[in-house]
């Protein structure tokens, strides 16, 4: 695919807004108001790397009086979570990126050991990078008395590929389930339809991680491995 420069946070903004429109169409976005909608679209901490927020889940927090007050417990906890995420990103992910980039920059001459070091480095770099950004967003949100959803739950401790995707980028998985997989029929229309819906869902997840056919195939491969 050609290199295209996209606006910052376009994927998260698109996902949250499309989910909002679907919820309005379904009549599930109750008590919606222009003020609440403005608050929803101007929440900035999650726009870099998630989590994906849902209007129905965030609305009660917008309507609560405590959202507009200063709570020092939330402020302290938010700073701690933000610092933890920043440490993951800067001290771990960025350091692992050096090893990963070194391996991928000369793939034609890699030894067996170097290939494994590069693969493992990128595996953990991806996790600490994504989860670090998500924790920074959660911490920053908590400073504003907003509880954003948890996005990662020890995915590399998963017992299966399906369990892995329930732990990895959890808000993306929930979005795909609620607004793509289930509306397409889920597992209610026979085995072929179920596999088709799963395949489309996993390809969308793969494409979300990167705008290239390699990521699309990556998403489909995970499904094939689990099957």
At which residue positions do the language-model features occur?
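Membrane-embedded transmembrane alpha-helical bundles that form the catalytic cores
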Residues: 1-227
């Amino acid at each position: 695919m050609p290199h295209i420069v996209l606006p910052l946070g376009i994927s998260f903004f698109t996902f949250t807004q499309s989910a909002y429109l679907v919820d309005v169409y379904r009549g599930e976005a109750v008590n919606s108001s222009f003020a609440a909608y403005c608050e929803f679209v101007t929440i900035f901490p999650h726009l870099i790397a998630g989590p994906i927020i849902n209007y129905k889940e965030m609305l009660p927090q917008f309507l609560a009086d405590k959202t507009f007050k200063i709570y020092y417990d939330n402020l302290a906890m938010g700073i701690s979570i933000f610092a933890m995420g920043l440490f993951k990103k800067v001290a771990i992910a960025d350091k692992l990126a050096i090893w990963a980039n070194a391996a991928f920059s000369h793939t034609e001459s890699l030894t067996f050991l170097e290939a494994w070091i590069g693969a493992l480095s990128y595996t953990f770099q991806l996790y600490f990078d994504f989860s670090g950004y998500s924790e920074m967003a959660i911490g920053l949100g908590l400073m504003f008395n907003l509880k954003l959803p948890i996005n990662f739950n020890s995915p590399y401790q998963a017992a299966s590929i399906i369990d892995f995707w329930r732990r990895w980028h959890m808000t993306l998985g929930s979005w795909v389930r609620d607004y793509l997989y289930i509306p397409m029929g889920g597992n209610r229309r026979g085995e072929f339809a179920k596999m088709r819906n799963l395949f489309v869902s996993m390809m969308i997840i793969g494409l979300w991680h990167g705008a290239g056919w390699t990521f699309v195939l990556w998403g489909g491969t995970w499904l094939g491995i689990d099957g």
